[in-house]
């Protein structure tokens, strides 16, 4: 695993200054690689784990348009943490969020608009920008429904604009508030934190199962469950049972079990809805 020596003063900070963003990440950019430290420095220490596991789940589903986050060790001002790294997806392109487009009057605001709004959003992008986002949004909705991403919103759904002013797809990113880990602090694993008791979806409907029904019936996902199991086992061995890398943001046994149970339960729910096949 790669290790980086960093100074917090050199970080590009994204602070939780309003209700739009729940995350608090310290970020550094080295050439075409982004390094991200979890928000544990302030309030949420598990964001690296959720980003990495979420990207593994996406890969296991064959969702290639999701950013792949890999584990790395970040030594920040002498403090060792598990962080994550990813490749820069923008390059020379300009990123514009759906919320930004709505705020400047380019598109309508489709938050909490249900299936009708979902279809209208796809139609509007087709008419105005000659891009079909249906498959992209289906991947987002499926991934979010499995990892229980409670922070998907119009601020982390984006498109890219290239040098020729053509609108193209933006990869799926920002899955850090997922897997229930943002609600699990100080060893609290009570039933109230379980996946079916209090989690709310975004951005079209408050229920993940309702959004999952937006996916076309003829779309089939094959799930590589061993890939997910290997990733969770890696964290269990090296960051729970043992602190192999001597980091401060380790996981507890209850959290590992919680994530295992949650993903298995969510996959079974999706299978019952005949949206994918587990292998």
What are these model-predicted stretches?
Residues 1-105:
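Conserved ATP-binding subdomain of kinase catalytic cores across diverse folds
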Residues 52-60, 135-143, 261, 265:
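A broad, structural surface signal
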Residues 68-77, 153-163, 276-279:
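Short alpha-helical "patches" and their helix-cap loops
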Residues 87-141, 163, 249-253, 269:
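ATP-dependent phospho-/nucleotidyl transfer catalytic cores
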Residues 10-11, 27, 118-131, 184-188, ...:
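A short, terminal or domain-edge coil/loop segment
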Residues 117-184:
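Conserved kinase catalytic-core segment
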Residues 47, 51, 136, 150-153, ...:
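Active-site-proximal structural scaffolding
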Residues 59, 162-279:
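C-terminal catalytic region of ATP-dependent kinase domains
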């Amino acid at each position: 695993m790669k290790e980086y020596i960093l100074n917090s003063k050199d970080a590009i900070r994204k602070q939780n200054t309003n209700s739009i963003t729940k995350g608090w990440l310290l970020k550094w950019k080295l050439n075409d690689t982004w390094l991200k430290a979890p928000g544990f420095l302030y309030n949420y220490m598990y964001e690296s784990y959720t980003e990495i596991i979420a990207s593994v789940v996406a890969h296991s589903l064959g969702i290639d348009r999701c950013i792949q986050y890999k584990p790395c060790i970040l030594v920040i001002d002498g403090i060792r943490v598990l962080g994550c790294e990813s490749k820069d997806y923008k390059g020379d392109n300009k990123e514009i969020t759906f919320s930004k487009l709505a705020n400047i009057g380019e598109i309508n605001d489709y938050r909490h608009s249900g299936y009708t709004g979902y279809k209208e959003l796809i139609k509007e992008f087709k008419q105005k920008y000659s891009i079909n986002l249906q498959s992209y949004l289906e991947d987002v909705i499926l991934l979010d429904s499995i990892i229980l991403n409670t922070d998907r919103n119009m601020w982390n759904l984006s498109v890219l604009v290239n040098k020729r002013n053509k609108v193209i797809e933006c990869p799926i990113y920002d899955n850090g508030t997922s897997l229930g880990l943002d609600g699990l602090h100080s060893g609290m694993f009570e039933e109230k934190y379980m996946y079916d008791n209090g989690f709310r979806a975004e951005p079209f409907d408050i229920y993940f199962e309702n959004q999952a029904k937006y996916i076309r019936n003829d779309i089939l996902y094959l799930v590589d469950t061993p890939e997910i199991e290997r990733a969770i086992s890696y964290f269990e061995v090296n960051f729970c049972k043992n602190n192999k890398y001597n980091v401060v943001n380790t996981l507890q046994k209850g959290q590992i079990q919680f994530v295992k149970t949650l993903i298995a339960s969510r996959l079974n729910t999706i299978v019952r809805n005949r949206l994918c096949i587990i292998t």
